[in-house]
C-alpha cells in the first residue's frame, strides 16, 4: 500500500504539510488522546485544527517578543476577523487581538480560563494559521532555507478551484462557490450567514439532524453564534423532525445535516428535508464532503452545501481548505453569498494553489475510490469478526442515497465497521496509514470513536451515550483509496486472519 503503517508514529503522507499522523496501535491512540507525555513525545504531529503545526509553533515564538507575550500565550489565526471573533466569544477586550510581522491572533495568558474558549473557537470555526502561510513567514525571517517543493497552480488558483467545483456541483455560476480556510470554516460561515439573515425575523433556533461531526455539533452546543438548537437523534426519523418543526413555529433558522453523517454514515432523505425546511421557512445546510459532488446531486435541494476540500477533492492529505456552494434557487442566495464572505476566511493563496493542482483529478479519483469501496464492503461483510458495515449502500441508507445519486456504484470511500472483536485485534495488525482524517488517495483506517469522542469513552455515562447513538469503542472507520481493490482486500485479509 502506498502509505502503509510504520512501526512508529509519523506524519502521513510525509509532507511537511501533512494533515494526518499514522498511529500504529490502539495503546498509542489512547496515550495520544489522553495526553500521556511519553506518547506525545513520540507523536509530534496531528490534524492541524486539533494540534498546532510545528511551523505555526515556530511563528508564535517568532512574534511573541513583538507583541509582549510568550509563544504559549498566542493563538494565531488566518485573519483579523477570526481573531476578533474568537476574542469576543471568550469575553476578552479588543486589545487581546494583535497583528505583528504579518501575523494575526489573540494574546491570552496560558493560565487564563479564556484561553480554552479562544482555542475552541478557532478550532471549531477552522480559522487557524495554516502551515504554508507559516512556512512563508519563517522563510521571510530566514529561519528556514526553502519552501517544500510541490505541484501547484500559480495562475489564478482560486478561480480554477471555483470553476471545477461549480462544474461538479452543477452550479450556474462560479460566483456561487466561496472558498474557505478549511472545511469547518465553510460550515461555520454557512451557519453564521444563515443565522445572521434569519435573526431579524426572530429565528434563532437550529435543528441538528443526527449525530454529526464533532466540530459541527460544537458550533451549536457551545453557541458560537448565539443560537439555540434542537437535536433530532435519528436522521431517518422524519416524523420526529416534523414534530420538532411544528413545536417551534416561526423560530427556526435552519436545519443542518450531513450526507452521509460522520461517523455513523447514515444518509437522510434529502428531498424530504427540503420539503420540511420549506414548510418551516428555514434554510437547509448540507455537508456532502463524504459523498462528494461527483457522486450525489444535492445542490438543488440545499440553500448551502459545504465541503472539506482537504478530503477527496485533493486526495493528497497535505492541505486544509473548504468550500461552500450556494443553491441558486435559494430565496436567500444573494444574502448567503455575501454572508459567506463576511463570516468566513479566504484561504491562503498557496493553499489554493495546491488544491487547484490536485482538484483536476477529482472526478477520476472518485471513480477509483468508489470501485474500491464497493469491493471492500463486500469483503468485510463476509468476515466473522465483523458485525456490520455502515455505508451509503447498507439497508438503512440505500433508498435515501439512491434518491440523490448521480450514477450507480458511487458510494464514496468511507466505511464504518462494527467489530465483534476488540479493536486492537484488527487495528494493530493493519498495514495501512492509521489516524485522523479521510479522503486521501491512499487507504486509511481510523479508530474514529477514540479520536472524535475520547471524552465520552472515558466514562460509563459517556459510553452509554455513545451506545445510544449506535457507537462504541470497537468500531473501525476505513477511508478507501485508489489502490487496486484486490490489493486493498489482501491487506485487510491479513489483518482479519486470526482476529477471531
From Swiss-Prot:
Domain of life: Bacteria
A GO term for molecular function: cystathionine gamma-synthase activity
Annotated SUPFAM superfamilies: PLP-dependent transferases
Enzyme Commission numbers on file: 4.5.1.-
Pfam families: Cys_Met_Meta_PP (PF01053)
Modified residues (N6-(pyridoxal phosphate)lysine): 311
InterPro entries: Cys/Met-Metab_PyrdxlP-dep_enz (IPR000277), PAGG_Syn_BesB (IPR055001), PyrdxlP-dep_Trfase (IPR015424), PyrdxlP-dep_Trfase_major (IPR015421), PyrdxlP-dep_Trfase_small (IPR015422), Trans-sulfuration_enzymes (IPR051750)
Phenotype on disruption: Cells lacking this gene no longer produce detectable amounts of L-propargylglycine and L-beta-ethynylserine, that are terminal alkyne-containing amino acids produced by wild-type S.cattleya. They accumulate the intermediate 4-chloro-allyl-L-glycine.
Reactions catalysed according to its record: L-2-amino-4-chloropent-4-enoate = L-propargylglycine + chloride + H(+)
Alphabetically ordered keywords of this record: Amino-acid biosynthesis, Antibiotic biosynthesis, Lyase, Plasmid, Pyridoxal phosphate
Pathway(s) of this molecule: Amino-acid metabolism; Antibiotic biosynthesis
Main enzyme class: lyase
Cofactor(s) named in the record: pyridoxal 5'-phosphate
Gene3D superfamilies named in the record: Aspartate Aminotransferase, domain 1 (3.90.1150.10), Type I PLP-dependent aspartate aminotransferase-like (Major domain) (3.40.640.10)
Biological process according to GO: antibiotic biosynthetic process; L-beta-ethynylserine biosynthetic process; L-propargylglycine biosynthetic process; transsulfuration
UniProt keyword Isomerase, yes or no: no
Summary of the function given for this chain in its UniProt record: Involved in the biosynthesis of terminal alkyne-containing amino acids such as L-propargylglycine (Pra) and L-beta-ethynylserine, that are produced as antibiotics by S.cattleya. Catalyzes gamma-elimination of chloride from 4-chloro-allyl-L-glycine (also named L-2-amino-4-chloropent-4-enoate), followed by an isomerization, to form the terminal-alkyne product L-propargylglycine.
Entry-linked NCBIfam families: PAGG_Syn_BesB
Assigned protein family: Belongs to the trans-sulfuration enzymes family.
Name of the featured protein: L-2-amino-4-chloropent-4-enoate dechlorinase/desaturase
Species annotation: Streptantibioticus cattleyicolor (strain ATCC 35852 / DSM 46488 / JCM 4925 / NBRC 14057 / NRRL 8057)
Gene that produces this protein: besB
